[in-house]
Structures are given as C-alpha cells and as structure tokens.
C-alpha cells in the first residue's frame, strides 16, 4: 500500500524542490523497463495496440500542434510516422512527475493507461519535457532546477550502455538515431504543453512560452545528436534572461 502521507513529485518541483536522487532512481527504473522488455515477444504481442497512445498522446500533442502551428508541421508529422513504426520495447507514455509518488520507501510509479510496445524515445522526451518546463518556471535558479534532468539522462544512458545493450540503442551508437529521435520527442512534448490541447498553467511570464517555442524549433532541426547538448542549450538560454 502507498503511504497515506506520500507526496507527488510534481508538487515538489513546482515548489522549487529539486532532488536529483529521485531522478536518478527513476532513470534506473525506466532503463530496467526498457531493457527488460526489449525482444520480449509475449509483451510485444500483448501491448502492440497503440490506439490509446494515439488518442491521448500523438493526436492531442503532436497532430494538434502540427495542424495549428504550420511551421512545425513537417518535423512533427515525420516524427509521428517514425514513432508509430517502431516496435522496440515497452513504452509507458505517461512517465511524468505527476505519476511519481514519493514514499518512505522511495518513488513509486503509477498510472500507465497509455502503455504500449513502441518507441522508447517517447518516454525520454515526455519525461524530460516535464523537468525542463519546470526549469523554465524556476529560471532564476536554473542550475539547481535543471540538475534533475541532467542526472536522469546521465543515469539512463549509462544503464543502457552496459553490454549487452538493446539493439535499438546499439544502432543509436553507430548513428545516433535513438538519441536524436528522443530529442525530437522532447521538443514535440514541450511544444504540446505551450501550444497543444493540454497546456501548462505555470509558465506565467510572457516571454516563457516564446522561449520554449524557439528552443523547440532549434531542436527540431535535427542538428543536435546528443541529449545533453539540448539540456545545456536550454540552460544557457535561461542564464541569459
């Protein structure tokens, strides 16, 4: 049973409490899920249906922005096509701070109705988009606010670099398809929270949505091959505010 006095991690982040050790543990959990389900035919067969994922993620997040913001239509439509074609591992598709309960025994992950067998890059982009949007909110403390995102990516990437690593990651090391597509998912998910159907209400300064759009526009060019580059880029943009 979950502790009655548990906290939701999202609330901590919004309040400016940044604990990188939570991000570290979550990175280990997600890496284990992705690694453990790779090549698992039984899981693949049970979770192959992407209907709910499409209805709750691709359509209101990616397609809506592509339709209402024509400047992003080409990269987003391309990303949608590539995402639906991938069948790499179990993808939770709702791995976010609002679904992380902090208990006396550590973080507990809940609520994955959007789970399916697909593109692990979506989980990475979706999760990091939440952390980086909270960083924009707390821009005056950018180095502390962005630390959980850096730690999450470092630990996740390290966990999947252990030999033998999943084939989809091995391909990524030769040509960084996985990492680059994760960056595209990061951009698409951040755009969805400022221009999609489900917008965040905590970016209250007028310049913040525009900064997010400019940042995501840069990421969608495809010229960034490493996630840490994208994270540091946002850090530098915020340091200039």
Report residues per predicted region.
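Active-site catalytic-loop/activation-segment of kinase and kinase-like phosphoryl-transfer enzymes
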Residues: 33-82
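Residue-level preference for long, well-ordered alpha-helices that form the structural scaffold
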Residues: 15-22, 50, 65-68, 141-145, ...
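Alpha-helical scaffolds flanking conserved acidic
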Residues: 178-188
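ATP-binding pocket architecture of kinase catalytic cores
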Residues: 1-42
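Active-site acidic catalytic loop and adjacent metal/ATP-binding pocket
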Residues: 77-122
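Surface-exposed helix-capping loop/turn segments at secondary-structure junctions
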Residues: 35-46, 159-178
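Active-site activation/catalytic loop segments of kinase-like enzymes and analogous catalytic loops
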Residues: 121-171, 186-204
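ATP/Mg2+ or Mg2+-diphosphate-binding catalytic cores
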Residues: 140-143, 189-241
């Amino acid at each position: 049973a979950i502790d009655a006095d548990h906290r939701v991690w999202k609330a901590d982040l919004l309040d400016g409490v940044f604990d990188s050790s939570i991000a570290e543990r979550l990175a280990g959990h997600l890496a284990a899920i992705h690694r453990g389900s790779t090549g698992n035919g039984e899981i693949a067969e049970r979770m192959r249906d992407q209907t709910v994922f499409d209805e709750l993620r691709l359509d209101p997040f990616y397609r809506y922005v592509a339709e209402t913001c024509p400047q992003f239509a080409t990269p987003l439509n391309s990303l949608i096509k590539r995402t639906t074609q991938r069948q790499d591992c179990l993808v939770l598709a709702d791995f976010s701070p609002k679904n992380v309960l902090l208990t006396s025994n550590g973080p507990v992950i809940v609520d994955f109705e959007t789970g399916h067998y697909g593109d692990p890059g979506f989980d990475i982009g979706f999760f990091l988009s939440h952390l980086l949007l909270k960083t924009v909110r707390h821009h005056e403390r950018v180095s502390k606010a962005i630390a959980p995102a850096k730690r999450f990516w470092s630990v996740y990437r390290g966990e999947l670099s252990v030999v033998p690593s999943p084939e989809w990651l091995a391909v990524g090391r030769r040509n960084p398809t996985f990492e680059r597509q994760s960056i595209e998912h990061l951009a698409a998910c951040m755009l969805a929270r400022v221009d999609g159907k489900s917008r965040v209400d905590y970016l209250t300064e007028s310049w913040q949505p525009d900064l997010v759009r400019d940042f995501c526009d840069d990421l969608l060019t495809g010229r960034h091959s490493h996630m840490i580059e994208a994270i540091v880029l946002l850090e530098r943009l915020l340091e200039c505010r």
